């Protein structure tokens, strides 16, 4: 994947402003609410019975932070995302058996959450750069499935 200097700047400058715990928790909660079938991967998280329960679930928040911390690793390694996610791809495929479509769904929710938090600062150029990034990340996470 080729990243322009502008894309790298847009991604990195916005990422430096986010609260990984807050955005991660909201992103994972959004995935579980909007796409309820994804909850089967997280049944051990306890109460996922309603949007309020999901949003307030400390395990959802903690795992969302973990997910976005890994996403931050991709941002630090934009030119080597596939290798950055090689072990996570193996884990999600071989051990956790996550449907690889869920990676793209999570990425799309992340873009929405970022847009919600950053308002007018999240320009169409930011949207395009982050959409490209989540597509590359989801493809890298799904790599082991191919």
UniProtKB/Swiss-Prot annotation:
Its signal peptide is none
Mind listing the GO biological process terms from this record? hydrogen peroxide catabolic process
Output one GO MF annotation.
haptoglobin binding
Which GO cellular component does the record give, naming just one? haptoglobin-hemoglobin complex
What are the binding positions for heme b in this chain? 63, 92
List, alphabetically, the Gene3D superfamilies matched.
Globins
Asked whether the UniProt record includes Zinc among its keywords, one would answer no
Subunit structure, interactors included: The major hemoglobin component (HbIII) is a tetramer of two alpha-2 chains and two beta-1 chains.
Protein purpose: Involved in oxygen transport from the lung to the various peripheral tissues.
Q: Which family does it belong to?
A: Belongs to the globin family.
Task: State the PANTHER family in the record.
Answer: HEMOGLOBIN FAMILY MEMBER, HEMOGLOBIN SUBUNIT EPSILON
- Name the record gives this protein: Hemoglobin subunit beta-1
